[in-house]
Swiss-Prot record:
DNA-dependent RNA polymerase catalyzes the transcription of DNA into RNA using the four ribonucleoside triphosphates as substrates. Belongs to the RNA polymerase beta' chain family. RpoC1 subfamily. This is DNA-directed RNA polymerase subunit beta'. Mg(2+) binds at D489, D491, D493. It is found in: Plastid, Chloroplast. Its EC number is 2.7.7.6. It is an enzyme of class 2 (transferase). In plastids the minimal PEP RNA polymerase catalytic core is composed of four subunits: alpha, beta, beta', and beta''. When a (nuclear-encoded) sigma factor is associated with the core the holoenzyme is formed, which can initiate transcription. GO terms for molecular function: DNA binding; DNA-directed RNA polymerase activity; magnesium ion binding; zinc ion binding. It catalyses: RNA(n) + a ribonucleoside 5'-triphosphate = RNA(n+1) + diphosphate. It comes from Gossypium hirsutum (Upland cotton). Binds 1 Mg(2+) ion per subunit. One of its GO terms (biological process) is DNA-templated transcription.
Length: 685
């Protein structure tokens, strides 16, 4: 369906019998109305043609071959000059055969049938709305017992019987003793109700708004009573309050979606289009049929039997009619959800039939496999590995995947640059993988985003757009900060890559789906591009440093022998176990030359205008120099003062890991301010 904003959407829910009839019924040009499936047959065994009014009837679902009717006559589709649009002999329209993929039929049920999803699945919607135990409703649906239908204030047999006797045999066995068959039918239609028809009557009598009001009043009364002190009673009250909340939410949903409760009981059963439940001929002339066809046949057989009992055979006992209604209910249950009531129905080879629920649910169902996760062209799949040097909005595509995804664009580039006269020559050049091919591929990729998806796609951040670049190897490179949105890690996870082809898809990818535009969680608003897992471990190792404190220094005589190999003679820093550096570049250079370790403590000269937060007011130790200057040593910094106590310089105690992290953060902040100043100048702010 299409909403008012012209967005295609799919909504699953209950529909009215009138809507089912509108889907399936169609009026032929001669005024005849078709759409009802009345026969359980598929194809005639001699002619191999669909049976009339059967499950594959061409009058109902359309022709098997476009423009050819059941008689074999041919008409050009859409040509008004060649005569009528349908065959007057067989009643088949001359239309495209693709109509058999969406044209539905229907079965008119001889008795109402409850939809098993709303009755048996938990929570049971029917039981919640009627506020009755599920076992009681099941007994009513499957004709195990009946209930009295109130008829104003007129005297009825049931009222009279209730006035004289209270304990007597069940209605099912006592009532037929007083009436003949004809009398029983009259009595039954007047005073008692059973089966799904009884459920339908109760649902039709519900006023959802009054139901909500009563539920609110009862919920408030239970809340005002408070705790009773009895644990069992308190639990019972809590369960009742939870039930009332569920009941109100369900009623509000029915009101909001304009769904009537009685629609949960079926009077018309939709029949799927034949192309969605095909019969295929395999080698040897054997036929393979969808299980849905066999389940439909079972429903039609039992429904036709019940129709005959109700219309033609007037001498049929009432018990037999009730039994046949139960069989129809069970057949529809098996069609919708095989095995929901116990043992599933099996074929002659002891194989369980696949019902409608089995066809649509699960990973291999219609939705997840065909509609949501269907295989498409211009897509690939590979393992993801970390790409720490990538930008946040970039991903690395292996050459093997990239050349296949963008092959058509590369072919167009080769032809436009007159490097290939036609498509065949261009493909041969691509197979040769010359340098010009990679140059054109890189040029194409610069202007074309790709979409990365990791299953299962549970929220919108499961699919994000990236700017691709070529990488070596056969794995997709991904920035580690985007892993949380995908719920991915680098232990063998696979991701699919798709190429948006249309201009609308490319614009949507650039404006809405790029990874650097999805930094916050759409659900709770918290940052989602945050370091996780390996990055946190790396940052910890980078900034952990040496656990030795300032007191474990070279003045300890027991440590001098252990750290003699760490003495460094250089003009830039003193000859000590913990060297001094004038700037961060010298410290990182010494680390690259393997003079110090990543976690080795060192003293780095700090700018005087930058504040140093003191952890202790009094210095731990003071060193005096012959020149008159002295060093005040604190826990994490050192101050060099003159004779007049003027601060000459400050050193902080740190590691190469801390310096590297600080420089990365500083560069990121400076880049942000440069980008911000550029934007303000561009917009004249």
């Amino acid at each position: 369906m299409i909403d008012r904003y012209k967005h295609q959407q799919l909504r699953i829910g209950s529909v009215s019998p009138q809507q089912i009839s509108a889907w399936a019924k169609k009026i032929l040009p001669n005024g005849e109305t078709v759409g009802e499936v009345t026969k359980p047959y598929t194809f005639h065994y001699k002619t191999n043609k669909p049976e009339k009014d059967g499950l594959f009837c061409e009058r109902i679902f359309g022709p098997i071959k476009s423009g050819i009717c059941a008689c074999g006559n041919y008409r050009v589709i859409g040509n008004q000059k060649e005569g009528p649009k349908f065959c007057e002999q067989c009643g088949v329209e001359f239309v495209d055969s693709r109509i058999r993929r969406y044209q539905m039929g229907y079965i008119r049920l001889a008795c109402p049938v409850t939809h098993v999803w709303y009755l048996k699945r938990l929570p049971s919607y029917i039981a919640n709305l009627l506020d009755k135990p599920l076992k009681e409703l099941e007994g009513l649906v499957y004709c195990d017992f009946s209930f009295a239908r109130p008829i104003a204030k007129k005297p009825t047999f049931l009222r009279l019987r209730g006035s004289f006797e209270y304990e007597i045999q069940s209605w099912k066995y006592s009532i037929p003793l007083f009436f003949t068959t004809q009398g029983f039918d009259t009595f039954r239609s007047r005073e008692i109700s059973t089966g799904a028809g009884a459920i339908r009557e109760q649902l039709a009598d519900l006023d959802l708004r009054i139901l909500i009001d009563y539920s609110v009043v009862e919920w408030k009364e239970l809340g005002e009573e408070g705790l009773t002190g009895n644990e069992w009673e308190d639990r019972k009250i809590g369960r009742r309050k939870d039930f009332l909340v569920r009941r109100m939410e369900l009623a509000k949903h029915f009101i909001r979606t304009n769904i009537e409760p009685e629609w949960m009981v079926l009077c018309l059963l939709p029949v799927l289009p034949p192309e969605l439940r095909p019969i295929i001929q395999i080698d040897g002339g054997k036929l393979m049929s969808s299980d849905i066809n066999e389940l439909y046949r079972r429903v039609i057989y039992r429904n036709n039997t019940l129709t005959d009992l109700l219309t033609t055979s007037r001498s049929t006992p009432g018990e037999l009619v009730m039994c046949q209604e139960k069989l129809v209910q069970e057949a529809v249950d098996t069609l919708l959800d095989n095995g929901i009531r116990g043992q599933p129905m099996r074929d002659g080879h002891n194989k369980v039939y696949k019902s409608f629920s089995d066809v649509i649910e699960g990973k291999e169902g219609r939705f997840r496999e065909t509609l949501l996760g269907k295989r498409v062209d211009y897509s690939g799949r590979s393992v993801i590995v970390v790409g720490p040097s990538l930008s946040l909005h970039r991903c690395g595509l292996p050459r093997e995947i990239a050349i296949e995804l963008f092959q058509t664009f590369v072919i167009r580039g080769l032809i436009r640059q007159h490097l290939a006269p036609n498509i065949g020559v261009a493909k041969s050049k691509i197979r040769e993988k010359g340098p010009i091919v990679w140059e054109i591929l890189q040029e194409v990729m610069r202007g074309h985003p790709v979409l990365l998806n990791r299953a299962p796609t549970l929220h919108r951040l499961g699919i994000q757009a990236f700017q691709p670049i070529l990488v070596e190897g056969r794995a997709i490179c991904l920035h580690p900060l985007v892993c949380k949105g995908f719920n991915a890690d680098f232990d063998g996870d696979q991701m699919a890559v798709h190429v948006p082809l249309s201009l609308e898809a490319q614009a949507e990818a650039r404006l809405l789906m790029f990874s650097h535009m999805n930094l916050l969680s759409p659900a709770i608003g918290d940052p989602i591009s945050v370091p996780t897992q390996d990055m946190l471990i790396g940052l910890y190792v980078l900034t952990s440093g040496n656990r030795r404190g300032i007191c474990a220094n070279r003045y300890n005589p027991w440590n001098r022998k252990s750290y003699q190999n760490e003495r460094i003679d250089d003009n830039n820093y003193k000859s000590t176990r913990e060297p001094f550096f004038c700037n961060s570049y010298d410290a990182i250079g010494a680390y690259r030359q393997k003079r110090i370790n990543l976690d080795s403590p060192l003293w780095l000269r700090w700018q005087l205008e930058q504040c140093v937060i003191a952890s202790r007011e009094a210095p731990i130790e003071v060193h005096y120099e012959s020149s008159g200057t002295y060093h005040e040593i604190y826990g994490h910094y050192l101050i060099v003062r003159s004779l007049k106590k003027k601060i000459l310089c400050i050193y902080i105690r740190t590691t190469v890991g801390h310096i590297s992290l600080y420089r990365e953060i500083e560069e990121a902040i400076q880049g942000f301010f440069r980008a911000y100043s550029y934007d303000t100048q561009s917009y004249g702010i």
